[in-house]
A protein has these predicted regions:
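Conserved MFS/SLC helix-loop-helix module at the cytosolic interface between two early adjacent transmembrane helices
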Residues: 51-87
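Helix-loop-helix hairpin linking two adjacent transmembrane segments in secondary transporters
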Residues: 130-174
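Cytoplasmic helix-loop-helix junction between adjacent transmembrane helices
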Residues: 95-136
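Structural signature of the two symmetry-related core transmembrane helices
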Residues: 67-81, 271-286
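Residue-level signature of mid-helix packing/kink "hotspots" within the transmembrane helices
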Residues: 18, 46-54, 138-139, 246-254, ...
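Juxtamembrane intracellular "pre-TM" segments in multi-pass secondary transporters
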Residues: 178-205, 229
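Helix-breaking motifs and short loop linkers at transmembrane-helix boundaries and internal kinks
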Residues: 32, 64, 85-91, 119, ...
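Extracytoplasmic gate region of multi-pass secondary transporters
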Residues: 20-21, 199-254, 313, 317
Length: 393
């Protein structure tokens, strides 16, 4: 029941943040924005999200998680509505930044709440089921914002998603329950310092930063890339840039949850092994997405990347919770999100700048090297710090 309720919150968490990317061409035409300015609109969310992450995590280890989840949902939904009222570039940047502030409190609190209900034997499956809402929300945000934007103007999607989010928040006030904490954090103790007792935490966070850099490029620029390179309509580019990749990610995340739970019963680094497989196998599909001139090959590439991205995504937080103490779980997620979205926050602007010199196709394909690098780092870290030792005969 808990995972089902949080699934819908996470759905709007991603639908609201994704919607703006599908209407970049409309914003560019109406407000006369450059690609760099559009990149900053996308990055403003991530910069604030990253800055607030550690604070949100520490608050999540000390304050009622239900309050943070429901309060955050209502706040960012209202900001989504306000985004529709923007009439200039500065207002867009401001509201995107405020949305990043509100959404930053969700994942630390929700992941801590799920871990309180699920032991290590079922944690990957529970979190992978929750993670599927990320892809559903991304598809919905990208697709419906594009369709509504094409027919009713770019503002319409923000009114719809924001209004529905507020209604969901009011429902959750009555039905969402706060679970007991496993361990009460000591007041005055530095949770952030305690996180890094296990060096594998730093490895997981570094890998997440690189993987998130690549993911943010796809989320931010793929709709515009399809609109310009393949001459798709606004609604079709919004759909195609999310649906193939994200549906495949749902399959990947469900596979990754089951596989990781099985491997983790035998090996200390079982979840990390699953993530490494996803990272390595995703490399050629990233390259193909940027390089191909064929729409069928493009669809195959996006779906292939999405599936193997799902293997990695299924265990982002489950792997982290394997190597941190229960009283530090929300803080760990906050710090991981913070550093990961610093990487993600650079991506929209960096790719806009690179595309101006090398072209968007080459810039997207080059990110296959980033994925390869973090895949190698994951393998080396797992072998060194987790040992690959059998823990269950």
């Amino acid at each position: 029941m808990l995972v089902a309720l949080l699934w819908f919150v996470c759905f709007f968490n991603y639908a609201d943040r994704q919607a703006i990317f599908s209407v970049f061409p409309l914003l560019k035409a109406e407000m006369g924005l450059t690609d760099i300015q559009l990149g900053i609109v996308g990055a403003a969310f991530m910069w604030v999200y990253a800055a607030i992450g550690p604070i949100a995590g520490m608050v999540g280890d000390r304050v009622q998680r239900k309050t943070l989840i429901v309060g955050g949902l209502i706040f960012w939904s209202l900001i989504t509505i306000c985004t529709a009222l923007s009439t200039n570039y500065l207002q867009l940047v401001l509201f995107r930044a405020l949305e990043g502030f509100g959404e930053a409190f969700y994942f630390p609190a929700s992941m801590s709440m799920i871990s309180a209900y699920h032991t290590s034997e079922t944690r990957s499956r529970a979190m992978s089921a929750h993670q599927s809402s990320v892809y559903a929300g991304t598809i919905a945000g990208g697709t419906f914002a594009g369709v509504l934007g094409q027919h009713y103007g770019w503002r319409s999607g923000f009114y719809v998603f924001g209004g529905l989010g507020v209604l969901l928040g009011l429902v959750l006030l009555a039905v969402l329950k706060e679970p007991a904490r496993e361990v009460v954090a000591e007041r005055g103790k530095s949770s952030i310092r305690g996180l890094f007792d296990n060096p594998m935490v730093a490895v997981l966070i570094a890998v997440f930063a690189g993987a998130n850099f690549v993911a943010m490029i796809f989320l931010t620029w793929l709709p515009t890339f399809l609109f310009t390179k393949f001459h798709m309509s606004l609604s079709l580019s919004g759909f195609s840039s999310t649906a193939y990749l994200q549906v495949a990610s749902v399959l990947g995340v469900l596979t990754g949850g089951v596989l990781a739970d099985k491997l983790s019963r035998k090996y200390k680094g079982g979840r990390m092994m699953t993530q490494a497989i996803g990272l390595f196998c995703g490399v050629p599909f990233i390259f193909l997405t940027g390089w191909t001139l064929s729409v069928p090959v493009l669809i195959l590439a996006m779906a292939g990347f999405g599936y193997f991205k799902g293997l990695y995504d299924a265990n982002i937080f489950a792997s982290l919770h394997d190597v941190v103490r229960p009283e530090h779980r929300a803080t760990a997620v906050g710090v991981m999100n913070s550093i990961g979205y610093l990487g993600g926050g650079i991506a929209p602007v960096a790719i806009a700048a690179a595309a101006g010199r090398y072209g968007m196709s080459a810039s997207i394909s080059a990110n296959s090297l980033v994925y390869l690098g973090v895949a190698v780092l994951m393998v080396l870290g797992t072998r060194r710090y987790m040992g690959g030792k059998i823990v269950v005969p």
